[in-house]
């Protein structure tokens, strides 16, 4: 009896440990893949949020009124980004499904439609932010002493919101293709250029005129 049972138990235990070891390795590989995907997305999102924060910090050396006005406008700008991200969420889901099924033609179609939709929505938002800057800021409770700075910043940054819409769509498409590192690197470069542009245009360095709030807006928009 023992001669029959012991080999059976030995084989069963060996299979169990082999299966458990394989499962643990698969889980570790999955964790590493998730980390490689999530880390660039987290960094990219953080850097996008830093664009407005950098403007606020650098403007604090120029004017207190500018800081207060830009802080209010940045809240509105971040809300518009949420609108774009709703469309991009659907883009990511569809692209991931089609890429998994190797339907590359459909992926191109989804990205194209998303770019068109976000471009149309972005143009509408740009027109709204540019044309209705004053009533929107009054609705947000911005005081008269801050109104001009707020309007200048909002009109310049808002007028080019559709560029950000297209950029976010392309980023979502690349993330769904497991290429999240490329949008992150682009965002790093954008932040560096924004800091240099702010320093040049806010304070009038390197031969540029001193533009204050308008300089920060131009640097952020472009």
Where are the language model's segments positioned?
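Helix-loop interface residues and adjacent transmembrane-helix termini in multi-pass membrane transporters
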Residues: 50-53, 61-64, 98-101, 176-177, ...
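Residue-level signal for short hydrophobic patches within transmembrane helices
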Residues: 31-50, 54, 76-83, 159, ...
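Interfacial/gating helices of multi-pass transporter permease domains
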Residues: 59-78, 144-149, 213-218
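Alpha-helical transmembrane segments of multi-pass membrane transporters/permeases
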Residues: 118, 173-200, 217
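Transmembrane alpha-helix boundary and packing residues in multipass membrane permease domains
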Residues: 41, 45, 56-57, 93, ...
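Recurrent gating helices in multi-pass secondary carriers
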Residues: 45-53, 126, 130, 191
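Short alpha-helical transmembrane segments in multi-pass integral membrane proteins
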Residues: 1-41, 95-162, 193-196, 208-222
